[in-house]
Amino acid sequence: MSFNLRNRSLLTVQDYTPREFRYLVDLARDLKRAKYARTEQEHLKGKEICLIFEKTSTRTRCAFEVACSDQGANVTYLDPAGSQIGHKESFKDTARVLGRMYDAIEYRGASQAGVETLAKYAGVPVYNGLTDEYHPTQMIADVMTMREHSDKPISEIKYAYIGDTRSNMGHSLLIVGCLMGMDVRICGPRSLWPSEEYQTIAKRLKAQSGARLMITDNPREAVEGVDFIHTDVWVSMGEPKEVWKERIQLLTPYQVNAELMAASGNPQTKFMHCLPAYHDTETTIGKQISDDYGMSDGLEVTDEVFESQANIAFEQAENRMHTIKALLVATLGD
């Protein structure tokens, strides 16, 4: 391999250099082509992978399980009820047990400190499948997807993230674009901007890569000339209704709708979303939002945009599997 990523963990977006990150994207594209052509070779035969999910997931779990299956690895899935981590057993002790049984561990949960503790004590690679602070595996897929849907070099791609920018997706899209030298626009209400900690990381990376960075509360300014518009959900299950009401009122001007897509001035602008998306009333939460707040045509994105040709969120979701496979092969492969 061109780069030696063997036995490396992935805990934050900035853990890898731009060249290492680009290598993972290139490897993912090669593995994707091989899967489509049915010429894929197994590089993880006999490996044991543990997936710890304190937060449930569709895409992350399926991406890891299919990637492992394709590459010959075995998987143990620990759901929120199937692990004692943080309840009866500390992250440190869990790491020291699982590290003796598995070749790698994936963790998806709230705690960034938790996943970092796993990596410190497990003695095997640990992958952050999502925490409250970062979503690094999603970023490899997002960069791959933008590259596939643009004829520009990665460093010339322009994208905006619109919405709650202090979220794990807000942090991650802020940082990955600055890492890779891209044109990054982060847009949301000032009260929901990334903290100084994340802005400082982004600015340091920007100085190294030559990235262009805008943080603004003006959606039309943010999307001008962009190739891609990203967003994510505004609310989460388990939050108090008062929080939902306040946040929805605050973020309604930041909904991705046909008008905002057109404001880019680029008819080829694509829409991206890590999913799930609240774009209609066909889910329990979607119907609840419609009933309580009168937003029957979607929350963070309208159904019109979501069902349009501009939406590439499903290609983005597929690429989760190819990029996670690349990460596994690069860090564990023979």
UniProtKB/Swiss-Prot annotation:
Q: Where does carbamoyl phosphate bind?
A: 57-60, 84, 108, 135-138, 274-275, 320
Q: Which domain of life is it from?
A: Bacteria
Name of a matching Pfam family = OTCace
Q: Which GO terms describe its biological process?
A: arginine biosynthetic process via ornithine; arginine catabolic process to ornithine; citrulline biosynthetic process; L-arginine biosynthetic process
Report keywords, A-Z. Answer: Arginine metabolism, Cytoplasm, Plasmid, Transferase
Q: Which GO terms describe its cellular component?
A: cytoplasm
User: Where are the disulfide bridges?
Assistant: none
SUPFAM superfamilies, alphabetized: Aspartate/ornithine carbamoyltransferase (SSF53671)
What this protein is called in its record is Ornithine carbamoyltransferase, catabolic
Q: Which gene encodes it?
A: arcB
